[in-house]
């Protein structure tokens, strides 16, 4: 109840929707703004939405937090009446907050605003919270700015005028010339509501105070005009009056105490509804007198600025928006809200859908439909031109035959009249066919210009979709991918090899098609290559395959003609006229020649050292390039356009610049290679130890348990003369088998005799650890 509320609380200003706090110290002292101003209008304090009011616009917007990290959150916004509600999702179940738009300033942010997002705009108010919102696209931004601007201008003359916090004059109340007088401090504690809220709660508790039928008929007519015409959202043009003067923002709005016969409202409403200062677009003379109550004895003396008329308090015209907002039913707040599927406001949604992805999908579909229509028209015109061309050739042949007959008949005897008549008919028919052919050619050129424009527009659209695919939001990426697939499918259907596209080259001397070569279109980049010398930058990155375009279909994005230029069957050799103008250049190497050249360059590299042991020989034969010929063979890969791309796959040990690892084909082969590589690594490690003398004791005997490497039987010749063992000697340190601490049998089979030095290693035998490293890197 009002009696239990603290003395300092929120009060709602009537004309500007401002919030100020009442000072409990002195009624004359200017009040200060509430610190927790951002909590107003959120969740429990939000306005309750009227389901009977039409919805002007709804959609997704990004809202920036007012405090903390100022993160962006995606919310579902609905503009109903003059209030902007936002929800968590599109089901519109529980409102998260509301923004009363009259007297708000809606402005878009400039390009240099540090918002972190594009398409942002700001809704600010001198005494209220500033909302920073962002749309997804520029089209959505324009729609929201237009709708929110109309809702914010519904206040009337106060929009766009400077608002100075003027102090009340001595003869005026705190609300202006027509405001109520000052009240005492005792009344200030229990009278802290704005006139609109008090009027609303009193009218809702006692609906019998409403004006009789004339006023009700007037308000019903206003409601019908508001639902049918959007002109109510434009500012009204009328001469200024004392009521249209700006009210002080810091002055608290008070109302006089209720008359003795009136009862206090049962409870303060949960939502400050009817704060919208919407004045009906009618003259304020007799209607104001009809809609207002008679002045009470507590009202102050009339001011001089009123022109002799009784002073008008905001209590008089606060009833008008209340009747409009209630739509003839003052008890609608007690009714449960309708489910979203049965709301009448969804039917009254004006304009096209607001989803930008849906708009873009419709644009893509429309563009592809026009492109297909122009393609069919081009094909039909080409068929007619071919028929007329064939008929023209037949007529020319018939005329040639008739001319020969006439010449022969003239030499022999007099020319018959029938032959002359036939020649005349053939000539007339030939003239008619040529005229028709010229008309069809001009029509085809006109259609082709339209087709080229559509292709350019489609290329721009594909660039936009690819930009969204890489840098857009997740929803935009999904929609862009679907549209790109649709575009590629349509272009693939239009550019099939079984449908040669009709096109006449611009350099052709005759408008008529010249054979099969002129009946096919070429892409713009290929035409430019014929007229300009090819630079090394243009050749860089082109796959080996001559002049065939083996690149991906995305190369045609920037070109105007992207429909059929990607298929190699649709490509053709340049015409003789264009070929004579092109500079003579050295022919490109084919794929086979390039692969043969690469193979010769690899064979010129440093060969691997020949192993001396049988195991190394076996391993070398297993992993030699000759035995791995299937791995380096040329494999044709058929691309999407039917062309063959030549690839080369080889192990990392044979081609240092090839980063493709070698993978064994079968599990058995892999295990065999692993076992051989392990044996090779062990043997190389022991061989290195024996070469450096690290595994010999002081007598020169090998350490126990260390196997000796076998010797190559082909290299065992006449042993050199014996020599005493010398420590750290690489040539004589392997003698005296069985002396010292015998090591027992070794797993390597044959061993050297006592005193016989091992065979001398070749100079390049030290490269085997590199072979081991390369072999291990292959796995």
UniProtKB/Swiss-Prot annotation:
The modification Phosphoserine is found at residues 164, 559. Disulfide bonds: none annotated. Coiled coil: none annotated. It is found in: Cytoplasm; Membrane. Residues 54-153 form the PH domain. Pfam families: PH. Highly expressed in melanoma. Detected at low levels in heart, skeletal muscle, kidney, liver and small intestine. GO terms for biological process: positive regulation of canonical Wnt signaling pathway; positive regulation of Wnt signaling pathway, planar cell polarity pathway. Residues 152-352, 492-670, 691-764 are annotated as: Disordered. Keywords: Cytoplasm, Lipid-binding, Membrane, Phosphoprotein. Its main location: cytoplasm. GO terms for cellular component: cytoplasm; extrinsic component of cytoplasmic side of plasma membrane; plasma membrane. Residues 704-724 have a biased composition (Pro residues). SUPFAM superfamilies: PH domain-like (SSF50729). SMART domains: PH (SM00233). InterPro entries: PH-like_dom_sf, PH_domain, PKHA4-7_PH. GO terms for molecular function: identical protein binding; phosphatidylinositol-3,4-bisphosphate binding; phosphatidylinositol-3,5-bisphosphate binding; phosphatidylinositol-3-phosphate binding; phosphatidylinositol-4,5-bisphosphate binding. Binds specifically to phosphatidylinositol 3-phosphate (PtdIns3P), but not to other phosphoinositides. This is Pleckstrin homology domain-containing family A member 4. It comes from Homo sapiens.
């Amino acid at each position: 109840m009002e009696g239990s509320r603290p003395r300092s609380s929120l009060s709602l200003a009537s004309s500007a929707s401002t919030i100020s706090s009442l000072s409990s110290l002195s009624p004359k002292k200017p009040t200060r703004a509430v610190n927790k101003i951002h909590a107003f209008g959120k969740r429990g304090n939000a306005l309750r939405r009227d389901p009977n009011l039409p919805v002007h616009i709804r959609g997704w917007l990004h809202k920036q937090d007012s405090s903390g990290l100022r993160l962006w959150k995606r919310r579902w916004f609905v503009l109903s009446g003059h209030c902007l509600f936002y929800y968590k999702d599109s089901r519109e179940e529980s409102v998260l907050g509301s923004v009363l738009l009259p007297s708000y300033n809606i402005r878009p942010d400039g390009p240099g605003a540090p918002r972190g997002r594009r398409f942002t705009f700001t809704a600010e108010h001198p005494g209220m919270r500033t909302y920073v919102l962002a749309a997804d696209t520029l089209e959505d931004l324009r729609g929201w700015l237009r709708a929110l601007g109309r809702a914010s201008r519904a206040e009337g003359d106060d929009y766009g005028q400077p608002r100075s916090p003027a102090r009340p004059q001595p003869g005026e109340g705190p609300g202006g010339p027509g405001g109520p007088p000052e009240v005492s401090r005792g009344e200030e504690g229990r009278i802290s509501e704005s006139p609109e809220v008090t009027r609303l709660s009193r009218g809702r508790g006692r609906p019998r105070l409403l004006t009789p039928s004339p006023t009700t008929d007037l308000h019903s007519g206003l409601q019908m005009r508001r639902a049918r015409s959007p002109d109510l959202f434009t500012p009204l043009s009328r001469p200024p009056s004392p009521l249209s003067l700006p009210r002080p923002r810091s002055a608290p709005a008070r109302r006089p105490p209720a008359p003795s016969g009136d009862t206090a409202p049962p409870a303060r409403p949960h939502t400050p509804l009817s704060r919208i200062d919407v004045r009906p677009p009618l003259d304020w003379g007799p209607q104001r007198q009809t809609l207002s109550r008679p002045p009470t004895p507590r009202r102050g003396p009339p001011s001089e600025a009123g022109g002799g008329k009784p002073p008008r308090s905001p209590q008089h015209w606060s009833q008008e928006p209340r009747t409009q907002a209630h739509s003839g039913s003052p008890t609608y707040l007690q009714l449960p809200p309708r489910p979203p599927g049965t709301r009448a406001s969804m039917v009254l949604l004006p304009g096209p859908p607001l989803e930008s992805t849906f708009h873009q999908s419709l644009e893509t579909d429309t563009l592809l439909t026009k492109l297909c229509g122009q393609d069919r028209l081009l094909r039909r015109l080409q068929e007619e031109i071919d028929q007329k061309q064939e008929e023209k050739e037949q007529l020319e042949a018939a005329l040639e035959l008739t001319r020969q007959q006439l010449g022969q008949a003239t030499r022999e005897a007099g020319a018959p009249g029938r032959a002359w008549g036939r020649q005349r008919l053939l000539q007339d028919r030939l003239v008619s066919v040529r005229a028709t052919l010229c008309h069809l050619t001009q029509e085809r050129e006109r259609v082709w210009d339209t087709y080229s424009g559509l292709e350019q527009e489609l290329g721009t659209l594909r660039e936009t979709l690819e930009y969204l695919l890489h840098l857009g939001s997740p929803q935009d990426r999904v929609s862009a991918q679907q549209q790109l697939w649709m575009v590629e499918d349509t272009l693939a259907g239009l550019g099939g090899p079984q449908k040669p596209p009709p096109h006449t080259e611009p350099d052709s001397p005759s408008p008529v098609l010249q054979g099969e070569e002129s009946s096919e279109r070429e892409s713009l980049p290929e035409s430019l290559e014929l007229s300009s010398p090819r630079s090394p930058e243009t050749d860089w990155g082109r796959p080996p395959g001559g002049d065939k375009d083996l690149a991906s279909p995305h190369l045609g994005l920037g070109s105007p003609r992207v429909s059929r230029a990607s298929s190699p069957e649709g490509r053709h050799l340049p015409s003789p006229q264009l070929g004579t103008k092109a500079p003579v250049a050295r022919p490109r190497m084919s794929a086979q020649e390039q692969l043969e050249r690469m193979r010769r360059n690899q064979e010129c590299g440093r060969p691997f050292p020949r192993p001396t042991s049988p195991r190394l020989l076996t391993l070398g034969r297993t992993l030699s390039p000759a035995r791995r010929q299937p791995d380096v063979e040329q494999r044709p890969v058929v691309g999407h356009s039917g062309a063959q791309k030549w690839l080369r796959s080889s192990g990392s040990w044979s081609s240092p610049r090839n980063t493709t690892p070698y993978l064994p084909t079968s599990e058995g082969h892999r295990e065999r290679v692993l076992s051989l590589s392990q044996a090779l690594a062990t043997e190389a490690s022991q061989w290195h130890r024996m070469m450096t003398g690290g595994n010999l004791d002081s007598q020169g005997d090998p350490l126990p348990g260390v196997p000796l490497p076998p010797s190559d039987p082909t290299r065992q010749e006449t042993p050199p003369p014996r020599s005493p063992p010398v420590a750290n000697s690489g040539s004589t340190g392997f003698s005296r088998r069985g002396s010292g601490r015998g090591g027992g049998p070794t797993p390597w089979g044959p061993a050297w005799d006592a005193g016989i030095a091992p065979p001398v290693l070749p100079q390049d035998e030290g490269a085997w650890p590199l072979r081991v490293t390369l072999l291990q890197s292959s796995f």
